[in-house]
From Swiss-Prot:
Pathway: Protein modification; protein ubiquitination. The BTB/POZ domain mediates the interaction with some component of ubiquitin ligase complexes. PROSITE patterns: BTB. The keyword Ion transport does not apply. This is BTB/POZ domain-containing protein At2g24240. It comes from Arabidopsis thaliana (Mouse-ear cress). PANTHER family: OSJNBA0029H02.24 PROTEIN (PTHR14499:SF116), POTASSIUM CHANNEL TETRAMERIZATION DOMAIN-CONTAINING (PTHR14499). May act as a substrate-specific adapter of an E3 ubiquitin-protein ligase complex (CUL3-RBX1-BTB) which mediates the ubiquitination and subsequent proteasomal degradation of target proteins. GO terms for biological process: protein homooligomerization; protein ubiquitination. Residues 6-76 form the BTB domain. The keyword Coiled coil does not apply. Keywords: Ubl conjugation pathway.
């Protein structure tokens, strides 16, 4: 290898390159180039004047420029899959991923890709992974994609319908499923995101007996807890809690008469309040039930329901809910994308609606999907038909809207790994939205 002070030469696939130690050090210790340095980050002397690497030279040029400038410039003649393969060889996949898109900002998102699957439409859920990948549930099958949008082995539950799915980390996925009649099966399982293999099955115990159950909505806490809404054959209706590390059940909050927990559509862990939001919504139930559960003393510390509330002509039914701890409120949305707010400081208070329905009613498609809500770093997102609206500021002003014309209404969306994934209902296709990387000055 040729070393002149801090310069180094490579022959990559017959093409000569010369660069500096400073550029190569940007690759990091765990990369291919990290082995060329000693413990003090000085280049180690080798016998050869030029280091030969039998790899693709065009990709090497792109990756070397990435290390030099921090910018990823890929010529049109280089397939993305090839670049990812070469980056993996050099240990630079994280560098490529960082350069492809910037920190998440709902007002700067651009459509990066659309991925069409082989399953039929009417997907159950899409969930963003922590590293920029995602998983999509269709019936009894969950399709898993890494951040390069390469599909891994699917997870197949053998005709048991998947109700919800969530990422423990980049290697592990939790699935909740319906109980299968005649088999006493169902519940929750931990699966490998790469192989699709079942690693662990979570059990529910009632009076020291293992029970068959249907698991629904999922949520996770920073203290390595898994929460799931549960329905059993006898009294196992409520919210179960499991330890992510051991897989053992640690608690169960039984629903009380006249209130719904086991049929919950949505669970959300509130770290600041150390409580779990549980929302059971129309049309799963005739009425809506939203509550905060404190598992430390098995207490429902706050609740709201539309039971007994007068319905307007347009029947503003709550279709989704999300807690916003910073403002001590819960945001709800109806089928017309009207946003409503409930004050968490008042027990059983009314909904303060912020009407936008006059703008939305004329745009309803033949088969609309119920709107969904998400909150990410101070920005509020609401899906409606084929678009996702972004709201910002203390008054939640509409600041941008994401829309594309293919695939029909959005049935679900998810934010994670600095990406937004939107699943369409009429075609089995999901969109990937990214924030462009910040310009290098």
């Amino acid at each position: 290898m040729g070393i002149s002070k801090d310069r180094i030469k490579f022959n990559v696939g017959g093409r000569l390159f010369e660069t500096t130690a400073t550029t190569l050090a940007n690759a990091g210790r765990d990369s291919f180039f990290g082995a060329l340095f000693d413990d003090e980050w000085n280049l180690s002397p080798l016998e050869d004047s030029i280091l030969f690497v039998d790899r693709n030279s065009d990709c090497f040029a792109v990756l070397l420029d990435l290390l030099r400038t921090g910018d990823l410039n890929v010529p049109a003649n280089i397939p993305e899959r090839l670049l990812h393969r070469e980056a993996s060889f050099y240990g630079l996949l994280d560098h490529v991923r960082t350069a492809k898109w910037g920190p998440f900002d709902g007002n700067r998102l651009r459509l990066s890709d659309s991925v069409k699957g082989i399953a039929p439409g009417d997907g159950t859920a899409i969930r963003a992974g922590p590293d920029g990948g995602c998983c999509v549930a269709h019936g009894s099958v969950v399709h898993v994609f890494d951040w390069m949008l390469e599909e891994h082995s699917p997870i197949n539950l053998d005709y048991q319908r998947v109700n919800d799915v969530g990422w423990i980390d980049s290697d592990n996925i939790v699935l909740s499923a319906c109980e299968k009649l005649g088999r006493g099966d169902g519940g929750m399982g931990l699966f490998s995101s790469s192989s699709g293999d079942l690693r662990y099955k979570f059990q529910v115990c009632h009076e020291n007996q293992v029970k068959s159950y249907t698991a629904g909505a999922l949520s996770f806490s920073p203290d390595y807890e898994i929460f799931a809404s549960c329905k059993g054959r006898s009294n196992e209706y409520g919210i179960g809690v499991w330890d992510q590390i051991t897989g053992k059940q640690t608690d169960f909050f039984y629903e009380s008469p006249g209130w719904s927990l086991g049929d919950a559509d949505k669970l959300q862990w509130l770290n600041g309040k150390n409580c779990l939001l549980v929302a059971t919504l129309f049309p799963r139930k005739d009425n809506c039930y939203i509550s905060l559960l404190d598992f430390r003393d098995k207490n429902m510390v706050w609740s709201w329901s539309d039971i007994g509330s007068p319905m307007a002509i347009d029947e503003k039914r709550v279709r989704d809910a999300i807690a916003m701890e910073d403002s001590n409120s819960i945001c709800v949305v109806n089928e017309f994308e009207d946003l409503g707010f409930i004050d968490l400081r008042m027990y059983g208070g009314s909904v303060r609606w912020s009407s936008r329905s006059k703008l939305m009613k004329s745009k309803m498609p033949d088969e609309p999907c119920y709107p969904k809500l998400a909150l990410h770093e101070g920005q509020l997102f609401s899906s409606m038909n084929d678009s996702i609206s972004v709201f910002c500021g203390p008054d939640w002003v509409l600041t941008s809207r994401l829309r594309r014309s293919y695939g029909g209404s959005i049935c679900d969306f998810s934010i994670g790994g600095d990406r937004l994934f939107a699943l369409h209902s009429e075609e089995n296709v999901f969109d990937v939205w990214e924030t462009p990387p910040c310009p290098i000055i």
